[in-house]
């Protein structure tokens, strides 16, 4: 079996600086507005292409069965869309991005897989040309293929490059698994009714995460603890990870030391570009 040299890729996390849910579409997705930026928290994926015609995925943590795995689904979508047959590849995933956190780890891995496949099989394709394919895998996958901080509309596939002033971010995550489907149908979800202009700067008075009310209603004790730590903590995606932004790294380090509950926490930096 002839193997090429293994190639390493990094797969970055994202946060939603705000997330407004507008309405449900006929295809089951929701129209939204959000502003994505990236974090220097990343997974590592190693791709070894070969002539085995087999797809093997391994990881340092327990992952979904192949047919339910977004990386596997990305490979199959790539095959179908670009008529690339007989793909043989071994993929080793080293996870650092927590799962079920709203940081987009699974979507990021899927996007990285599309990029690795493109690099090997169809190097003439641009990242932008793969965005419609990425959208078929999930609403968060396009931003990771795009690779730049962006304002997003539609289901997340209409992207406008929009830098965010670099900051430090303190991430905290309780041991809570969020059901995205449950949050979307919750009576506590108050959808945004007014479109806001993508030309606005970051304005927390009108930019919020519509899912925070759902989380606060479901987990009032943690929500109260969070507000006592700092009222500017925000949720990314549908949670359960919250973040606090600051240009002052020392401030965030001091706050992290005050946390006296068993929460996962990270101190990271925001990134405008990941490619």
Curated annotation (Swiss-Prot):
This entry's Gene Ontology molecular function terms read: 4-(cytidine 5'-diphospho)-2-C-methyl-D-erythritol kinase activity; ATP binding
Q: What class of enzyme is it?
A: transferase
Any GO BP: isopentenyl diphosphate biosynthetic process, methylerythritol 4-phosphate pathway
Q: Look up the EC number in the record and give it.
A: 2.7.1.148
Identify the residues that bind ATP: 98-108
Q: Which reaction does it catalyse?
A: 4-CDP-2-C-methyl-D-erythritol + ATP = 4-CDP-2-C-methyl-D-erythritol 2-phosphate + ADP + H(+)
Question: Can you tell me which residues form the catalytic site?
Answer: 14, 140
Q: Report the superkingdom from the record.
A: Bacteria
Keyword terms of this UniProt record = ATP-binding, Isoprene biosynthesis, Kinase, Nucleotide-binding, Transferase
Q: In which pathway does it act?
A: Isoprenoid biosynthesis; isopentenyl diphosphate biosynthesis via DXP pathway; isopentenyl diphosphate from 1-deoxy-D-xylulose 5-phosphate: step 3/6
| The UniProt record lists the keyword Cell wall biogenesis/degradation | no
Instruction: Tell me the NCBIfam families matching this sequence.
Output: ispE
Q: Which family does it belong to?
A: Belongs to the GHMP kinase family. IspE subfamily.
Functional summary from the UniProt entry? Catalyzes the phosphorylation of the position 2 hydroxy group of 4-diphosphocytidyl-2C-methyl-D-erythritol.
HAMAP family given for it? IspE
Q: What is the protein named?
A: 4-diphosphocytidyl-2-C-methyl-D-erythritol kinase
